[in-house]
Each structure stands twice: as C-alpha cells, then as structure tokens.
UniProtKB/Swiss-Prot annotation:
Effect caused by changing residue 1086 to D: Phospho-mimetic mutant; does not affect autophagy
Keyword Oxidoreductase part of the UniProt annotation: no
Origin organism lineage: Eukaryota, Fungi, Dikarya, Ascomycota, Saccharomycotina
Protein name: Autophagy-related protein 2
Modified residues (Phosphoserine): 236, 249, 1086
Species name: Saccharomyces cerevisiae (strain ATCC 204508 / S288c) (Baker's yeast)
Extra information: Present with 876 molecules/cell in log phase SD medium.
C-alpha cells in the first residue's frame, strides 16, 4: 500500500534536496505548489551551483555546472534524481585543521533535512544529541543558534514531530534513486602554478538503485582519469554565482499539484561574454589530455542508510570488470604535480590517523567494529608499461572473513609481449590473508619472467617514479604522522615458490633461477639458492651460484666494522644488511667481455639517473665520506673511529671465481678465492668493498700443480683487508692491495703470441699510440691504485730462478680512457733465488716484515731501489714513458750476479726466427753475372789497338798537393784537439812534415754512395716515433762480494775440494811418495784449484782466506767458508745514468708488398755522467780501480760513458736485425792491483750451466758498424805473482807481472769496424788492433811508468830542458849568466817534485824494512805506528801482540783460488804494503794501508806529523826497555842468563825503533814538501791509496 505523503512534507522534502545540492538560489518559488500526482517532476537546464553552500570535506569547489537536472517525486514517497552534464572544478585542501570528516558531513546533511522539515522542533534536543555523539560543525552550530533564538516549541510536542520527521526520511531513503550521466570533475592540484597539470575524472554514468531489504546498488560505467596540461587557470569561477537563496522561494510557494518546468532564470539567462572563450579553452585542453586510468564497469552493492538513526553501511561488495592503467603516462607526471598529490594524500592520512589515535585513546568497546567491506572482485587489470608492453592481472579478489581478517588472491599474472613475457601454470598465483597483526602471502606457483632491454628501461622508469613518490612522501610525512605503538604494526610474511627471471640479450639469455624463499618482516628474507644460467642457442651453462642468502631490514641501523682509505678501522651503520654464505662464478673470458658489453647498455639507464641525482645533491654531502667520528671506550682510553651511514650492506663469506680461456685454451683457467668479503653502498652513492683473504691461481692440464698468481704473504695478528676498493661520490675509484704477492710469468707471453687470432693479426702491427687513440672518450673517471707491503714475483721464461720486488708503498693513479698515469714507489727491495722450488713457506711462523720473510725463506737480498717515479703520457702521437729513480743499490756475488743478468734477459719472450725467415737463401730468378762484361777487353788485339791512346793518360803527380799535405795534417790535428777527442795517433811520436797523417774518421765523414750508407734515424723518422722512453737514475751503487749466495754453488765447490782431497789420498796410497801427481780442477769456468800432497791441508785455508779476506796461518780450517764475504771487494758507482729509448713506427709487409727498404726499428742511448770502481780487496792498498783522468781536456758537461745503439732491419720483409754501435769513453785513470784484477776476472767469468739461455734458433747479433773514440788511459799496475807455466806456454802478457807500473800512458786509438758477427768477434778484432799498436808505437809511454825508470827519466827530462834553455839563450844573447839562472829555475821546477817523491819512496821502503827486521827479532813491527800504552803495560800484552801480528808470508801467499802453479815473488815493492791493526773493525780484522796514504798537505803539516812520529817511536823504544827491566826484576830465576835473554829481546827494539821513527819523520817531511810544490799531487794520492782516516 502506497504511503501517503502530505503536500507540506513534499515541499519541505524538495526544499531539503534543493538546499543540499545548492540549486535555485536565484529562482522565486513563492507561488510554487507541489502536486502529489504520480508524474510530478522538476527539470532544470544550465544551472550554476552556489559555491558558498556547497561544502565537501577536504575539497574547495571553484565551479559547479549542471547541464540538465530532473527531480521526480513519487506518490509512494520515493525520490528520483536524474542529471547529465555535471561539471565541477575543485581544489584540494592542504590543511587538515578545520576540515570535516565524512561522518560529520553525513550527520550534518540529516540535521539540515530535519531543520527544513520541522521548524518548530526543539533545537536543544537535536544539539544535545549531536553533542553526545561528539559531532559538531560550524555550519550546524550556527543554524542551531539562530533557530534557538527564533522559536522555542513546547516540550510535549517535540517528540511526536521528531518521530514524524524520522519516518518521512526513512521513506525517502528507502525509495531513493539517482541517475547521473556525463559527470566531469577536474582537480586543480596547484592553483598557484597555472602551467601545472590538471587531474580530470570523467564518469559516463552513475546509478544508485535501492532494492528490498535496504540493499543498494551503485553502478558506474566508464570511469576515466586523465591528466591535462593547462596553460592558464582563472583565479575566479567562470560563472559568477548569485548569493540569493533559492530555498526561500520554494519555502513560500503555495501552489499544489503543479508540474513545474523551469528552463531559464532571469539573472542567469543573460549570456556571459566569457563563455565562448571557456569553451575554446576546454577544446584546446582536450587536445593535450592524457588518459591515465580507465575502468569500464564498477558495481558497488551494500546494505545501509536504512533509517535516519542508522546510517551505517555494511556488506560492501565491489565488482570491477576491467581496469586499464597507463603506467608509462603516469610516470611522466610533472614533479610539481606529483609532489602536490603526495602532499594532499599525506595531509588527509594525517587527519584520519589523528582521529583514529583520538578514538583509540577513548575507552574501547568490548568488541571491535567489523569492517564494512565484504569483498572486492576485479576481473582484469591491464598495466600498460609502454609500447607493446602490457601486463595483465586477472581475478583479483578481496574478501572479508568472519574473524575480522581479509583474504585476497590473484588468479594470474602474465604478459605475452616481446619485451616482457610472464607466465605460470597453476591458479591462483597469489593468495594471502591480512589480520590486524600480520599479513601472510603465499605464491602458489613458479613464475617465469623474460624481459628485454626495453622492458628494463620501462621498469626502471617505474622504479624512479616510485622512488620519487616515496621521497616526497617521506619528506612530507616527517613530523606529521603520530607515533603508533609497536604492537599495532603488522608483520608481513611471504612464502614463495621458485622464480625464474631471464634477461634477453642480442645473442643469449641470462636466466636467474631463485629457489623457494621465505620472507618475514620481523626477521629476514631467506633464499636458499640462486642460480644464474647463460642460455645460448646451442648450449646452456651455469655461470653463477649464490647460496644461503639472508636479507634483513632492521628498525634500527646495524653497526658494522669497516675500514677507511688508510685501512684504519671505521664503522658503518646500515638498515638493510644482507649475508651470502657462498658465491660461485664460472665463465669464459670471451663470454664475460660480451656480457659486460651488453650490460653496459643497461648501465646508461643508471648513469643518466645518477647524474641527475648527483646534480641535486649538496656539495657538503659529496665529501662527507667517513667525516664523522665515533668515540669508542676501549679499556682505559678512548678510540676514535670514523663512521658512515649506508643504504645497503652485504657480507659474503666465500667467493669462488673461475674465468677460463682468458688468453686461449692453452692458458687454462684462472680461479680466485675471496674470503670474508664486505660490500656497502652509502647514502651519498659511494661504494666500499674489501676482502680479508685472497688467492688467485691458474689451472691447466699441462701443469701438475696450480700456478699461483696472487695470494696473501704474511699471517698477521691483525686481520686487515688485503684488497680494498672504494668508489667516491665524484666517481674516483681507489684500489688498495695490502700484504699481497703478485706473480708475473714470462711464459704467458708465449701463450699470448700463439693465441693472437687472425682478426688481431692486422692490429698487432699497428703502432701502440694509434691503438691507444682509438675509441677514447674525452674524459674518464679518475682512479688510484696502492700497493702496501706487497711483493712482485718475476718468473723468467726458461730459468728456474725468481726475482722478488718488495713494494713498501707504491701509488699509481690516472684517468680511465686516457693514456696517462703516474707511479710513485718510495722503497723497493730486491730479492733473488736460484731455484723457486727451494722456496718453502713456513705457515706457522709470524714474520715481522716482508724483508725478514723472504730473507728467512732462502732468498738473497741483492739490492734496493729508492724513490721511483714513473710517468705515462701521450704527446705528438707518441707514447711517452718517463722513469726517474733516485738511487739503485745492488749487492751481488759472482753466482747471484750471473743469475740476475740472465734473469733480466729472460723476462721477455725469446723471439727467434729460422734462417729462412731472416735471410733470402734462394733467388726467384737466376742472375747472369757476365751480362755486362766485355769478353774482348783483355785480348791482345784490343790492348795493342788502344795502347797508343794511353801514352798521355798516365797519372801525373801534382807537387802543390803534396806541399799542402803538411798543412792538412796540422789543421786536422789542431781541430781534433780542440774537440777534445783523442783520435790523433800521438803514440807514433813526432811526425815529420813529409809523412802523411791518416785521418781515422775520413771514411766516416766522406759521403758514400746511397746503397752503402748505413741507416741512421733521420728527422722524418724522428717524427714517426711510436714510443719514447727515458730512464734517469741519479745514483747506482753496485757492491761486488766474494763468496757465493747459492747453496748449490757452495755445496758444489766443497764437494769438488773433498773429491780432490780423496783423489790425492788415493793416489798417494797407490803410488810412491815421489810420484804423487798434482790434481787440478776447474769450477764454473772461473775457479781453478790445483793441489798436491804438500798443500792439501792449506787448500781450504787459502780458499777461506781469499773469500773472507783474512788468512790465518795458525788455524785449522776443516770446512771452507764459501758464504758471501763480510765486506764487499769492489764497488761500482755510477752517477747520473740516463737511458733514452725510441721505438719507430715500421710496417711489416710481406715479400710481395715490400719495397726492399731499410727500417730503423729502435734506438737506445745510454749515457753515464760519472763512474768509478772502488777497490776494497783486503790485500790491496789502492783505492779507486777506475776513475776519471783529471787535468785532461774533456768537456765537463759530457758524460764519461756514451753508448749509442741502433737496431736496423736491412730488408723490411725479412726478420734479420743488425746493430750499429757508437761508443765514447772519457780519459780514464786506472789503479790496477793484481789481486783486485783477478777478483774481477773471477767474478765476471763465473758461469753456471743452470743459467744458460738456450734458444730454439740460436741467434748471434750481427754488428753492422762499430765505432769508438780514442780512449786515453793512465795506468798504475801492481803485480804480485807470475804464472811461469803460462809464460812457458807462450803467454807473453805474463811479462807484465814482472814490472810495477806507475803512470804509464796508453791510448786506445779510434776504431771503426764493419760487419762483425757477434761480440766475440768484436773483442778479438779490438785486441788485434789495439795490442800491436800499443806494443809497437806506445812503448815509450808504457816504459815511462816503470818505477825504477820513472825518476831517472824525470831527471833526464829536466837536464834536457836545462841544456835546451841554455843553448837557446846563449845563441840569442851570447853569454850564459842570465840563461843559467833561467835554466836553473826551469830545472828545479821540473825535477824537484820527482826528487822529493824519490826520497819519499826510499824513506818509506827503509821504514818498512826496519819494521820487518824488528818484527823478526820479536818487536811490534808495523803495529807500532799507532801507539797504545795499554798494550805495553804488561808482559801478557806483549805476548798477545806478537801473536796477533799478521805474517807477511801469508800476505804474499800464492792465490790458490786461481791455481797453485803461480809462484811467489817477494821483490815487488813490499815497502808500500803495511798492516795496521789499530783501526776498529769486526773482530779486530786488520786493515792494510799504504805508507803513502794520508799525506800532509804542506810542509808545516809534514813537520808536525814528523815530530809526532819520532815521539811515538821513541816512546815505543823506551817502553820496551822499561818493560824488559821490569821483567828482569820479576823473574824469580834471576842470574846473568835471564838478564841476557831480556836484554836480547829489548835490544832490537831499542836500537831499530828510533831508526824507524827517524825514517818516518823524514818521509812525512818530504811528503809535505812534495804536496807543497805540486798542489794536485795530494788529490791523485787520495784517489790512488786507501785512507786510514776514513776508516777511523
């Protein structure tokens, strides 16, 4: 039965509706009557809504237009609203302070309805009810206050009217129907920026239908959300609304049963002139409209709004058909628009959260309110990621359970597009359940995803978009969201099956297979296994395996230990920390290169985004790495550690990496094991990585054991990182190696050469500089590499020996893609071992340093390199290599010296060629040698015919030419002298004018023919230099020790001596004593040992004395000490060594393309500014073995040694290489002691067969040309023994050992040689040229240096000068008076020095003879030169001193090390050799100095030293007599015989010692006189003799 509704109530109901939709504010309804007919309705067109009366929570309405609105009222009480063309422009509100909640808005609407229907009801009652429900609003309160003042109804009738009102409203709500079409809502996100985007929501139709049982249905068709790029937004609404209230006219109308149609309003009917402009603007906006989201059908069913007292909604069921999301357009929303949207969301969430927090603080009911939502069902979701990339989600369901939990599921998730393919089998794919405490997710099937580069690019844009949203959200939500208790936070749990992700590359697929994993937000994400496969069309290989992966997202940052750039301990705080137990990687090198090239395309995405992020970051944060510090209490002191905040940290327990076929199949694979790894990404995009254990090996079937490449050296107590990598925010990459040994194997060069493919063969011959210039960016990231306490182990190609370079602190840096780098190494120690198999590591022992480690493992420390600077650069198309070294020091024995030299040669690949490739042995076409020969030339008829024509053709001598010969010779001589070269043959004596002086360099200076010209690098070739290298060494010191470093050498020599001893013993036992033969042995081509039955016992003692420098005749040596001597025997010192290298660009054509040209391959210039050889042999008294000959014309800026080498290829397509050498040597001063000479010969002649380099095709260097300047020598030679056996065999050079030379003049004349086959032939040729020249032409200069002849020649020269001066003056003046005085002065100047020097020699010789005579009679001998009273204070001291004196017989004992066949000679200036026991040394070893050393500088100094010497020796004589007197008194035997004995002991000393003092005093005086006359003499003496002053 229809419910009857009174007319007055219908009018009030209509009034309420009009008030709520704010219509008809300008329409007069005073005569309005409402009919209760079945077809009563109201129709409105083009209505502008009153904005002041429209109040929607959190939104400000700027414009509201309705094209058509129809209101229908049925007899049964139902209300139908039909509308179309609804357009709203709104601006979201950003402030939540005065905004209403949705519940407030609903209650306020009902309150307005009540007030409109019942004006006489008691407003206090309504107000109190609202007050009790905590609902208030400004609008409602103002209306209530006005109504309270207007009328006050009776209390008894208010309840009846209220029931009537509620009943009427319930009927209206039960029959409410709404149908709206073409609804458009535009949200102005930022009204301050007109150019910002506008979000438009368009609904094609909305229907609200109410069925029985209060079940309501909302059906929305075709929802579209778009983004509009608007150029200008008006500040005020387009249509200015009137403030007249339409409700007044409706309220005063008395018309009933009227069908009202209002199509126009008087004030609104006038056309607005701006309306056409708005329409045009909208049309323009539609052109730039981008659709972001589309929903084709949305159905919402719910129960609720049953009565005024019960406005709750329940059992909400949402059914959505299809949802289309344009993700690729959403991510392109402007940042300002996105930021504003996030601000609105955060503001509203903050308001709701605040309300929920206030509600939670009030007393909670016993039962929690159930959720109104019942279920959500979305049939299909289409995610459009870009062109041809669509992801489809089907059957998404959300259902509310009885226990207030929410269950949801996803049926399928797939994509069939080419850039992205997603598939699975089982449905549903994902299920889950949400409770107030937790969210549980379960993926029920394996997921297979294949994505290409385009797909990753789109996903990366989405990731960037989400990151921006999260960043905006976090920045806005700081300080706004209230703190929620930890017990209310939901935990998330995810259980997943296997996931397979494949990255699509052009030639392969990279597949990631993730095993089933579990995620718990309270704990961690755990993945058992991740495998990475590389799928090729023909095969599939596993390249990566990661096991036991744990990722923790912590609430509070985790403190982790780390290190800074200086390897000092630091702290890292990370909120996301991952742990991987093991990582295994295995792939071929070519596959890695291809993979890196393909992944680099993806890297551009990250690079571009990172550059944009870095530009927005502040400068202060860029350099904030490890700038903060944390104070940690450690025992009783504070330890400061730098700290760093990280976004992500990763710890990997073990990493096993295997890379195969790096160079080729023969090389095998390289395997690396890294333990205890740590990786972190900081807040400012810095990367930190380090590992604490590292081992890299090479494995191949050809090797029995793995070949070590890189490993940890020492087991330190403090476990520091061995590899540290740090990438700063500015892109600089820093790598540090610590406590690592790195191996270099020359064998790798052979594998590299064999595995150069045909594609690389053409580029192999390309110049290095051109290779570096290809495909180089203009700039790159800076990098730096450091090696701290590392060692570089160099393995030669053929030898078993190894050299180790210990790098204390090496730093190198440069920029990527730019051929420029700098290297600095402060201290580098060199170690050497003869066989690397002898290197046995003691793992249990802790070594303090690398030097101690290698020294304790059998290595020999051979040298040190201080402050090495190395620079690589590119200039003028050439690669520049510049090396500067401050000092190089080497300490070598004979065996280690050979090992070192051979190892340096063997560090490169021994490239040799067969003769077929070096020489053209066969000609393509035969050559007719008689082609151009006239066969009739020598016939008798031809000779007679042409005989008469040759009568006047004979050669005529030109006299003038011969006359000018002398002038030419003199001019050439003066020119050569001015240039400082000694090419003039001065040894030929005084040249007469008629003798033609040959010009040695004439052949070189003449212009030869083109085909005979030796190739020399021209200026054009200098421009074609590919590599320029220079090595500058400030100082080189090479110490040569006697003895042997290698245990093998010492053992071999000792076994040889033992074998020799056994042979002699066996021969002596088997034969008679008189017929025992002499045994000889030759060891290492440098040690000659011979012994017979008489000297077998002394053989070991002589060997030990030769090596260690001290011989003791009284000690019994059972074992030879062959270890290196305590002190070096010779020292080579080079100053300012410069090596200049040039490598030229040459083509390597084959024979068909060759032009038979000659190529200069490279050039090397070695120059030594100054060099000396110091003599430190104990038995030698001389100081400098070789030094510069002073006071000779040699340019000061010219080096003493210059060697210019050019390597030339005569024919460009053949492999034969020839050498052009040019040598220049300064004048030299030689002080040659025979013992030192034999040591150097023995040292340099040592040859061990273990270190011989044998090539497949032995090659001897062909010297195309060798040239040298004239070398002037001044020689002092002291022989000590003569090899009579060699003399008898014809070795005439042994005759030199009979003579002592002092200042002999020798000139090695300039030589130019062509066509020498090797250095052996060069040596023989030089001997054949220089030896006859010296013996035939330079004997006067050699004999001038003989000791007995030198003084007489000097006197004879003085006499000759005197006579010459007298005769010249007499011829000019006719008398001898003045000429005699002048000649006498010249005679004194030229002969005084020689007379004095002769006196010095005589007195020194006399002193030595007297000291030896005293020593034979029991005196102290030469030990008395330094007086020490303590030694003569007791009788015990005398006995010990006598025993400590080194016997001169042992001093001149034959050198058994070079053969006992050498005989002793005792008459070679023994007066110049003395023994000084006073100088301090190790174990009181004697130091041998000369009587000529430490001479006084002038006569006064000589007199002082003479007086001191005389006083010293008189004291010695006095002490000897006084000591003898004391011994006589203390002798208990007494008697004349005892007195005679003591007197006999003291008499020689008392008599001879004053004589010794007198001779020494005379010698010192004469030395002072000689140095006073000749100021340069003392400098020469210091160069020649060892000084005792420096030793003290």
């Amino acid at each position: 039965m229809a419910f009857w509704l009174p007319q007055n109530i219908q009018k009030r109901l209509l009034l309420y509706v009009l008030q709520q939709i704010s219509l008809f504010s300008n329409i007069d309804l005073s005569n309005l009557d409402v009919s209760i007919g079945s077809k009563s309705h109201f129709s409105f067109h083009d209505v502008n809504l009153s904005l002041d009366d429209l109040n929607i929570p959190n939104v400000q309405i700027n414009e509201g237009i309705v094209d058509e609105l129809v209101l229908k009222l049925t007899v049964s009480g139902g209300v139908e609203i039909d509308g179309s063309g609804l357009r709203f422009i709104m601006t979201p509100l950003y402030s939540s302070g005065s905004q209403e909640l949705h519940s407030d808005f609903l209650v306020k609407s009902i309150q307005d309805l009540t007030n409109s229907m019942l004006q006489f009801s008691d407003p206090l009652t309504t107000y109190n009810r609202y007050k009790e429900d905590d609902i208030s609003s400004s609008d409602s309160s103002s209306d209530l206050n006005s109504n309270i003042e207007a009328s006050k109804p009776a209390a008894n009738g208010s309840y009846t009217l209220q029931n009537m009102r509620n009943k009427a409203l319930n009927v209206a709500l039960a029959k409410l129907k709404i149908a709206l079409k073409d609804v458009t809502i535009r949200f102005i996100v930022n009204d301050r920026d007109p150019s910002d985007n506008i979000v438009e929501v368009h609904l094609e139709s909305i229907q609200l239908i109410t069925t029985d049982a209060n079940l309501r249905h909302i059906n929305i068709e075709n929802i579209t959300i778009s983004s509009i790029q608007k150029q200008a937004v008006p500040d005020s609404p387009v249509h200015p609304f009137n403030n007249d209230d339409l409700s007044q006219s409706v309220y005063l109308s008395k018309m009933e049963a009227t069908s009202l149609y209002m199509s126009a309003m008087e004030e609104q009917s006038n056309e607005d002139p701006s309306e056409p402009q708005v329409t045009q603007e909208e049309q323009e906006n539609d052109k730039c409209k981008e659709s972001l989201m589309e929903i084709n059908n949305l159905n919402i069913a719910f129960k609720g709004l049953s009565s005024v007292n019960d406005l709750r909604m329940s059992n909400i069921v949402i059914d959505i058909q299809d949802v289309h999301l344009a993700i690729h357009k959403i991510v392109e929303i402007k940042n300002s628009t996105l930021k504003n949207i996030i601000d609105i969301i955060v503001t509203h969430l903050d308001a709701n959260e605040s309300f929920s927090c206030q509600d939670s603080q009030s007393p909670s009911p016993d039962k929690q309110e159930p959720s109104a939502l019942s279920s959500v069902d979305i049939k299909c979701i289409y995610l459009n990621l870009g062109q041809d990339i669509t992801v489809i989600l089907k059957s998404f369901k959300l259902e509310q359970k009885e226990n207030n939990s929410l269950a949801f599921s996803l049926g399928s998730f797939y994509s069939n597009s080419s850039p992205l393919t997603i598939s699975h089998k089982t449905k549903p794919l994902l299920t889950g359940e949400q409770t107030p405490q937790s969210i549980a997710l379960n993926m029920g099937d394996e997921l297979d995803i294949i994505i290409s580069h385009d797909g990753i690019a789109h996903f990366f844009k989405i990731f960037q978009f989400v990151s921006k949203c999260m960043s905006f959200y976090q920045n806005k939500s700081k300080g706004m969201m209230p703190q929620i208790a930890s017990d209310t936070k939901r935990t998330v749990q995810l259980t997943s099956k296997a996931v397979k992700l494949s990255l699509k590359f052009p030639y392969f697929l990279l597949c990631f297979q993730v095993s089933p994993f579990i995620y718990d937000s309270n704990r961690e994400l755990y993945i058992e296994l991740v495998d990475v496969f590389k799928k090729l069309p023909s095969r599939c290989t596993k390249i990566l395996t990661m096991s036991s992966i744990t990722i923790s997202n912590l609430q509070s940052p985790l403190q982790l230990g780390s290190y800074d750039d200086t390897l000092k301990e630091a702290l890292i705080y990370s909120s996301v920390h991952a742990i991987i137990k093991e990582v295994i990687f295995n792939e071929e090198y070519s596959g890695i290169v291809q993979l890196v090239e393909d992944i680099s395309a993806f890297g551009k995405l990250f690079t571009d985004s990172k550059n944009s992020e870095c530009t927005g970051k502040s400068k202060s944060k860029r350099g904030s790495f490890l700038q903060r510090s944390v104070r940690v209490l450690n025992s009783s002191r504070f330890v400061y550690k730098q700290s760093l905040s990280a976004n992500f940290s990763l710890k990997i327990d073990s990493m096993k990496l295997k890379v195969s076929e790096i160079i080729g199949p023969q090389f095998g694979s390289v395997e690396a094991l890294l333990s205890n790894n740590f990786f972190a990404i900081t807040d400012d995009s810095q990367i930190v990585y380090f590992t604490k254990n590292l081992k890299v090996e090479r494995k191949t079937p050809s090797l029995l054991e793995p070949q070590e490449i890189m490993s940890v050296v020492l087991n330190k107590a403090v476990n520091e990182p061995v590899l540290y990598v740090h990438r700063r925010a500015n892109g600089k990459l820093k790598v540090i190696f610590n406590n690592i040994r790195i191996h270099y194997y020359a064998r790798w060069l052979e594998i590299l050469k064999k595995n150069i493919g045909p594609d690389n063969a053409s580029s192999k011959d390309e110049p290095v500089s051109q290779k570096l210039s290809k495909k180089q960016p203009t700039s790159g990231f800076p990098w730096e590499l450091k090696c701290l306490d590392c060692s570089l182990i160099l393995h030669p190609f053929r030898l078993k020996s190894v050299m180790v370079i210990v790098l204390d602190n090496l730093t190198t840096g440069g920029s990527s893609f730019i051929p420029q780098a700098k290297l600095l190494s402060k201290a580098n120690t060199l170690f050497l071992i003869d066989d690397y198999q002898n290197f046995k590591i003691q793992k249990d022992k802790n070594w303090p340093s690398l030097i101690n480690f290698y020294a304790g493992q059998g290595f020999s420390a051979i040298g040190k390199i201080d402050t090495l600077n190395f620079l690589i650069n590119k200039s003028d198309g050439a690669l520049l290599l510049d090396c500067k070294i401050e000092q190089v020091g080497l300490s070598l024995c004979a065996d280690s010296f050979q090992t070192f030299c051979q190892l340096c040669i063997d560090l490169k690949y021994p490239q040799t060629f067969p003769d077929e490739e070096k020489f053209r042995t066969q000609l393509k076409n035969p050559i007719d040698v008689f082609k151009d020969i006239d066969c009739d030339l020598f016939n008798s008829a031809f000779i007679r015919e042409n005989n008469h024509q040759n009568d006047y053709d004979s050669v005529h001598l030109v006299d003038s030419f011969l006359d000018k010969t002398h002038e030419f010779n003199n001019g050439a001589r003066s020119k050569l002298s001015s240039q400082g070269s000694y090419e003039m043959d001065s040894s030929s004596g005084t040249a007469t004018g008629g003798i033609l002086l040959p010009h040695e360099s004439y052949l070189d200076s003449a212009q030869p023919k083109e085909e005979d010209t030796p190739p020399i690098a021209s200026k054009e070739q200098e421009r074609d230099v590919d590599i320029r290298g220079s090595i500058d060494v400030e100082k080189v010191v090479i110490k040569l020790f006697d003895g042997y470093d290698w245990k093998y050498t010492r053992k071999f020599i000792a076994n040889t001596v033992e074998k020799l001893d056994k042979e002699l013993s066996k021969a002596e036992a088997s034969s008679s004593k008189s017929n025992v033969p002499q045994s000889e042995a030759n060891i290492f081509d440098s040690i000659y040992i011979s012994a017979n039955k008489n000297n077998v016992t002394d053989l070991r003692r002589n060997l030990d004395g030769e090596i260690q420098g001290v011989q003791n005749s009284f000690s019994d040596v059972s074992k030879v000490n062959l270890r290196p001597s305590k002190h070096y025997k010779a020292l080579i010192q080079l100053n300012k060594v410069h090596v200049n290298l040039k490598n030229y660009r040459v083509d390597e054509p084959d024979e068909s393309n060759s032009d038979n040209s000659t190529d200069v391959l490279n050039r090397c210039v070695v120059s030594i500014y100054e060099f000396e050889i110091i003599d430190n042999v104990p038995t030698s008294t001389w100081n400098k073995f070789v030094t510069l000959l002073k006071h000779e014309p040699w340019p000061h800026s010219s080096p003493m040694f210059l060697l210019d080498l050019e390597f030339i290829r005569p024919i460009d397509f053949l492999q034969a290489v020839e050498l052009v050498m040019q040598l220049n040597v300064a004048p030299l001063r030689l002080h040659v002691d025979q013992d030192t000479l034999e040591f150097l010969i023995r040292f340099l002649g040592f040859k061990d067969k273990r270190f011989e380099l044998i090539d497949e095709y032995p090659d001897i260097v062909f010297i195309q040309k060798f040239s040298t300047n004239s070398i002037k020598l001044r020689l002092d030679y002291k022989p000590k023994k003569v090899d009579y056996a060699g003399l008898r065999s014809g070795q005439t050079s042994e005759l030199m050992n009979f003579f002592t030379l002092d200042g002999s003049k020798i000139i090695l004349k300039s030589v130019v040689l062509y066509g020498l086959n090797g250095f052996d032939e060069l040596n023989n040729k030089l001997k054949a040229i220089w030896t006859p020249d010296i013996t035939k032409k330079q004997l006067p200069g050699v004999l001038e240096g003989l000791a007995p002849v030198r003084s007489f020649m000097a006197i004879g020269s003085g006499v000759k000068t005197l006579v010459t001066v007298l005769m010249s003056e007499y011829r000019q003046e006719g008398h001898l008076g003045r000429s005699l005085k002048k000649g006498g002065n010249v005679f004194l100047k030229t002969t005084t020095g020689d007379f004095v020097k002769l006196g010095v020699k005589l007195t020194s010789g006399t002193q030595a003879i007297l000291e030896n005579t005293e020593e034979l009679f029991g005196g102290v001998g030469s030990n008395g030169r330094v007086y020490d009273a303590s030694k003569f204070g007791s009788a015990d001291g005398a006995d010990s001193d006598t025993a400590a004196v080194l016997d001169l017989d042992t001093l001149f004992e034959e050198d058994q090390l070079v053969g006992s066949k050498y005989s002793r000679i005792r008459d070679h200036e023994p007066t110049a050799v003395v023994i000084d026991m006073s100088s301090p040394g190790d174990h009181n070893e004697p130091t041998i100095v000369s009587l000529y050393a430490d001479q006084p500088l002038d006569l006064p100094t000589g007199l002082k030293e003479a007086y001191s010497s005389l006083e010293k020796h008189m004291h010695i004589a006095y002490d000897a007599v006084w000591r003898a007197k004391g011994q006589m008194k203390d002798d208990k035997r007494g008697g004349p015989s005892a007195a005679a004995v003591y007197v006999a002991r003291a008499a020689p000393v008392a008599i001879i010692r004053p004589l010794i003092g007198a001779t020494e005093a005379v010698s010192k005086t004469l030395q002072g006189i000689a140095n006073q006359v000749d100021k340069t003499h003392n400098e020469q003496i210091n160069d020649k003799y060892k000084s005792n002053r420096t030793d003290s």
